[in-house]
Amino acid sequence: MAMKRVVFLLLLVAASALVKSSRGGGGGEEKLGKFYGWRRHLSSGPAASSLVLSGDLVDKIWSVCLQDIVSPEDTFGFGESFAWDELSSHSTEDELKATLFMELMALLPPEKSSFTYDCIRANCFSLGVPQIFSVALSNYLESQKSLVGSNFYPRRRLVDKLIGDAPSMAPAFAPSMSSGGEVHSPLSVAEAPLTPSNSLNMEPPSPYYPSKSAHKHQGVAPPVSPSEEYHDYMKVVLIAVLPTAALSFLAAFLCFYCCGCNKSKVSVGEQRDDHPLLHLQFSNLPGSSPDVHVPASPLHKDDHGVRPSNAGVSMSKCFPCCFKTSSDATTPTLVTGGTQENNATSDAPKLMPPPPPPPPPPPPPPPPPPPRPPPPPPPIKKGAPPPAPPKATMARFPKLSPTESSRSEESSASELASESSETEVNAPRAKLRPFYWDKVLANPDQSMAWHDIKFGSFHVNEEMIEELFGYGAGNQNNVKDKEISIADPSPQHVSLLDVKKSCNLAVVFKAMNVRAEEIHDALVEGNELPRLLLETILRMKPTDEEEQKLRLYNGDCSQLGLAEQVMKALIDIPFAFERIRALLFMSSLQEDASSLRESFLQLEAACGELKHRLFLKLLEAILKTGNRLNDGTFRGGANAFKLDTLLKLSDVKGADGKTTLLHFVVQEIIRSEGVREARLAMENGRSPPFPSTSDDNSNESLQEDGNYYSNLGLKIVSGLSNELDNVKRVAALDADALSTSVANLRHELLRAKEFLNSDMASLEENSGFHRSLESFIEHAETETNFLLKEDKRLRMLVKRTIRYFHGNDEKDDGFRLFVIVRDFLVMLDKACKEVGASQKKATNKSQANGNSNNPSSQSNPQEQQFPAVLDHHFDSSDSND
């Protein structure tokens, strides 16, 4: 871009040098003196302290007001009158831009220059200049036109001058012919103000149009001869045509070159917005034609900031090195003498806005929006606002080609879809039921399973999840009930009880579907009521204060709550809560008495089961085995032991570390019990339970078949737990609880009897409740007396059973004896299973070795370990029946 700018300036300087070399020297020196006088006026005059025509401001004025109205005919002779050698060596880029701009303003026709000044005033905000300074700027430019305009009008009207009355090549300023035949001349320096007035008018100034008197000649050229006129005419034609043709060719070449470069640098993502912000008609201004329209400001705002429009063919597009659009300036500057001022805080009066524009013509279809950057990451906190968009930047978006336009439309469609989905995500959502979990902090340095999750592969169905897990989802079935309750709200009930007590009573009454009338009838007639209801009423009996409130309430009972209505009906009955207690005893006696009777029967049966033959034989085997182990010590020679010892049999282990003393006792018992069962079967005439090889010697065959006897005895010993079933049931009872239950029944009976004989007798009523209570007391007295007798008898039975095993032990342990036997039976069942598994394993091993056909050839290890018990099996079998 810098190289193009330098080339363009060099071409302008070269073209001006050609024009300068073909012109007279005196006129050039006079014009150069006037030009430098104008420059000195710009730098040293009063305007220099208040107004500065910077390069950025020239760029903005060009893009806003001059870009679409300047034609190639207006630039004829552009840049021919200055001393470019001295100017280019002593001037900066901003000064050069200001100079070229002033020259262009001098060359423009009056109507276009007036339009330019009006545009500057109307677009003060687009130019970055306050409105009060834009008026001063336009007046300033009009005043400077008189300083520089006389240098260019003769050259611009060169052809018209030759046709005039007295053409001359003198250095004096020649008159220029207008299109109407009138002669125009610029205003004098004294007639135009150089600085803005301190007191600005609140109304916008009317457009300036030069008067007809201002277009007259300032002087008359001397007469010339016809030969010199023809010679001068040809010279002027050559001077005007040749440089103009060369300059036009170079300008066209540079125009096409710059346009081609700019088109090649267009980005696919950049787009232009050609819609004007404001349409002003030139007919609104005084003295203007109604067909001329003021071009709107080519600066438009969109989501990305301020962008220049592309209305028609723009010279700035062909000469970007000299004329920058407003998109190149990132910060608008004021044309004030130093510092920027805030328009919002300025104390200067604001000018009246322009008249409202007429409705604009229908705009062309908008181009597709530019592609957006990738969507931001999801917010950290739910409900957090989306991140603020980036600051608007002033960028230039050239027109796209058709292929790039189609690609941009596709990308913009996808971006719009993603933007809409983003908007849906960031939109406020319905609150759902919480899902409690423990979040894990992501570790970027460690590979985790969560890193492989693709966040776009699964989408939550918002409608379904809101329907299922929304806070109002569970109550959708009750919407009608809620609407009915809202439309017809229930009246507020009068509360006379404690809130918690009233709620609990109301829940029980509604659950059992009882009314106050039913409870009243039951207390008067002696009808049966549910036990839970009676217990709840007695437990939540109203206090004396609450009872007093209920008695004093004389209002409508329908205004009371359900609990208050029931309690109000109860307190009107004499001795209501004593009646409820009596009804509760009547309803519970039969159930409690049946439970006590069953427990007493189990206790009596358990005392008899402890004297079972097989259990006593186990105790005998344990006693003899223990005496053998304790032989020679002070523990030996025992005749009995406490049953607590049964729980220690599993603690004594053999040499192998597996076989316990309980295993040994079980092995000995199952052998003897198997032989006894087979012998009883033969004596009772039943067939032998196993095939006998010899009918004459049956006892010998029984002894030889040791494995069979063991299996048969194992079944008998394993069934001992079922034989002592009542012992296990009594072990779950509490002796004190049984005695307390019997005593409570007796106490309730005495209380009901006293209520009948005292309180009910004083009422002298012959109600159904009175008669029911009398008959019930007679029956309850018989029942409670029986239970008392049974309790005493069974307690004595338990004591005798304890003395049967433990001797004269005065300590009363209740049912602890049954608990010990229950735990021993559990250990016995476990030992029987282990012994049966070991025997089955030994049998399979002997069959594999081929010794199963002659079992009597091998000596039984049990006979060697415990021969005394085995020898005594047959001798004591008859006595143990």
Swiss-Prot record:
Pfam families in alphabetical order: FH2
Composition bias, Low complexity: 400-424, 846-865
Segments passing through the bilayer: 236-256
Protein name: Formin-like protein 10
Ranges of compositional bias, category Polar residues: 333-346, 692-701
The gene coding this protein: FH10
Family: Belongs to the formin-like family. Class-I subfamily.
Subcellular locations according to the entry: Membrane
Gene3D superfamilies assigned: Formin, FH2 domain (1.20.58.2220)
GO CC terms, sorted: cytoskeleton; membrane
Basic and acidic residues composition-biased segments: 870-881
Domain FH2, chain residue ranges per copy: 422-854
Alphabetical GO biological process terms: actin cytoskeleton organization; actin nucleation
Ranges annotated as biased composition (Pro residues): 351-390
SUPFAM superfamilies referenced in this protein's UniProt entry, alphabetically: Formin homology 2 domain (FH2 domain)
Residues forming coiled coils: none
Recorded topology in the membrane: Single-pass membrane protein
GO molecular function, a single term: actin filament binding
Superkingdom to which the source organism belongs: Eukaryota
